UniProtKB/Swiss-Prot annotation:
Cofactor info, note text: Binds 1 Mg(2+) ion per subunit.
Species this protein is from: Shigella boydii serotype 18 (strain CDC 3083-94 / BS512)
KW Ribosomal protein (keyword) present: no
Binding-site list for Mg(2+): 199, 213
Positions of disulphide bridges: none
Binding site for substrate: 264, 321-323
Protein's name in the database: Succinate--CoA ligase [ADP-forming] subunit beta
Length: 388
């Protein structure tokens, strides 16, 4: 679950981290009043969406008058912001952040993720702040410096100093950087985060460090014990199909293709998408119905997949281990009949009672194609999309 920038900065403030004074606003009038609270300009106004690239898309602007603040708010509130990280529809802008402008001397980067290879929280710092860190990692990886947190000791001040020295910081900036490092690490661990990022972390012309931006991603599996974070969830920023899937404990991720995929098991789902791509197709989604693929869940999965107008064919790939394939077949038949599926459905069943399940599909009289294997299934769905 992602948080907005203003929410991230609210957390920073609770942990004593330096950030510009700012207010999240939902109306042009609130935006003007926020500027008055902050004091003399210039100010920075930012669209609050769960996506990067806001500046290049016009969603961040430095303004010198309250009239400009009102104009920015009137232009963006209620609209959708399209960036390189969104789809063509963009993300809805329901709030803008008004904050004091900062005199920037230098931009740095500081962030942390859970590194699955080392099984630790790893902090990354770079002198290349203000740009996509993925681009820096690809083009100049030597400019990214890392430290891993020991799960027994947690963050240590010497690790912050080590990163500060590698960034070329001196004097009081080393102390300030170490404090920010320790604060971010504490937030990460106490709040069960999956990602934390300050890009940019700036050195002001007055010689101080300021968290100019903030990006936080919480671990959705831990929200049951992070109630205040759960209340910060903004469902307007989420794909409605993904939100609907979550209510049925279905793991759904929307993609850009036209072949709907319904699979039991995350690994098999990824493998299914790979083989569809290998045969020239484009998956429209990742959807894992899990081990309990009941008729109700399969029906809901069909509804979610078919709510995407781009879907031209549906591939159902089920491996019957714990679950019996004949019961899955009953669920598929019932779901197709109930939902009224008007696109071809290709089903591959393998494992427990697979032959009986395939026979039930063949005898159903519905527009369901029983594939003989995974390769055959991929070829069938690609052919269906191409009208063959």
């Amino acid at each position: 679950m992602n948080l907005h920038e203003y929410q991230a900065k609210q957390l920073f403030a609770r942990y004593g981290l330096p950030a510009p004074v700012g207010y999240a606003c939902t109306t042009p009038r609130e935006a003007e009043e926020a500027a008055s609270k902050i004091g003399a300009g210039p100010w920075v106004v930012k669209c609050q969406v769960h996506a990067g690239g806001r500046g290049k898309a016009g969603g961040v602007k430095v303004v010198n008058s309250k009239e400009d603040i009102r104009a920015f708010a009137e232009n963006w509130l209620g609209k959708r912001l399209v960036t390189y990280q969104t789809d063509a529809n963009g993300q809805p802008v329901n709030q803008i952040l008004v904050e004091a402008a900062t005199d920037i001397a230098k931009e740095l980067y500081l962030g942390a993720v859970v590194d699955r290879s080392s099984r630790r929280v790893v902090f990354m710092a770079s002198t290349e702040g203000g740009v996509e860190i993925e681009k820096v990692a690809e083009e100049t990886p030597q400019l990214i410096h890392k430290v891993a947190l020991d799960p027994l000791t947690g963050p240590m001040p010497y690790q912050g100093r080590e990163l500060a020295f590698k960034l070329g910081l001196e004097g009081k900036l080393v102390q300030q950087f170490t404090k920010i490092f320790m604060g971010l690490a504490t937030i990460f661990l106490e709040r069960d985060l999956a990602l934390i990022e300050i890009n940019p972390l700036v050195i002001t012309k007055q010689g101080d460090l300021i968290c100019l931006d903030g990006k936080l991603g919480a671990d959705g599996n831990a929200l049951f014990r992070q109630l205040d974070l759960r209340e910060m969830r903004d469902q307007s920023q989420e794909d409605p199909r993904e939100a609907q899937a979550a209510q049925w404990e279905l793991n759904y991720v929307a993609l850009d293709g036209n072949i709907g995929c319904m699979v039991n098991g995350a690994g098999l789902a990824m493998g299914t998408m790979d083989i569809v791509k290998l045969h020239g197709g484009e998956p429209a989604n990742f959807l894992d119905v899990g081990g309990g693929a009941t008729k109700e869940r399969v029906t809901e999965a069909f509804k979610i997949i078919l709510s995407d107008d781009k879907v031209k064919v549906v591939l159902v790939n089920i491996f019957g281990g714990i679950v019996r394939c004949d019961l899955i077949a009953d669920g598929i038949i019932g779901a197709v009949a109930e939902v009224g599926v008007n696109v071809p459905v290709v089903v591959r069943l393998e494992g427990n009672n697979a032959e009986l399940g395939a026979k039930k599909l063949a005898d159903s009289g519905l527009n369901i194609i029983a594939a003989k294997g995974l390769t055959d299934a991929a070829q069938q769905v690609v052919a269906a999309v191409e009208g063959k």
